[in-house]
Amino acid sequence: MITKYFSKVIVRFNPFGKEAKVARLVLAAIPPTQRNMGTQIQSEIISDYNKVKPLVKVTYKDKKEMEVDPSNMNFQELANHFDRHSKQLDLKHMLEMH
């Protein structure tokens, strides 16, 4: 997963739900150096009694926001979903450099 264009990541999950693995992998995919360089990361644990839905929400450096329910997809599908916009930003960045 291309994370260098993320400015903010919000992950909300039940640690005992089926979305827990995907949510933890998303958090683990963000390198520590990026966390120190200003990417805001918020994680929230929800319980079975909560009616709040699990969520992974990413805000990119160009202010675009994307969000998905991690219980409906595996990590690879989620990574591909977020990588679509990251690849567009990467291409735009490469074109600006030349």
UniProtKB/Swiss-Prot annotation:
Pfam families: MRP_L53. Its main location: mitochondrion. Gene3D superfamilies: Glutaredoxin. GO terms for molecular function: structural constituent of ribosome. It comes from the Eukaryota. Keywords: Mitochondrion, Ribonucleoprotein, Ribosomal protein. It is found in: Mitochondrion. One of its GO terms (cellular component) is mitochondrial inner membrane. GO terms for biological process: mitochondrial translation. Transmembrane segments: none annotated. Component of the mitochondrial ribosome (mitoribosome), a dedicated translation machinery responsible for the synthesis of mitochondrial genome-encoded proteins, including at least some of the essential transmembrane subunits of the mitochondrial respiratory chain. The mitoribosomes are attached to the mitochondrial inner membrane and translation products are cotranslationally integrated into the membrane. Component of the mitochondrial large ribosomal subunit (mt-LSU). Mature yeast 74S mitochondrial ribosomes consist of a small (37S) and a large (54S) subunit. The 37S small subunit contains a 15S ribosomal RNA (15S mt-rRNA) and 34 different proteins. The 54S large subunit contains a 21S rRNA (21S mt-rRNA) and 46 different proteins. Present with 1550 molecules/cell in log phase SD medium. Belongs to the mitochondrion-specific ribosomal protein mL53 family. This is Large ribosomal subunit protein mL53. It comes from Saccharomyces cerevisiae (strain ATCC 204508 / S288c) (Baker's yeast). The lineage of its organism: Eukaryota, Fungi, Dikarya, Ascomycota, Saccharomycotina.
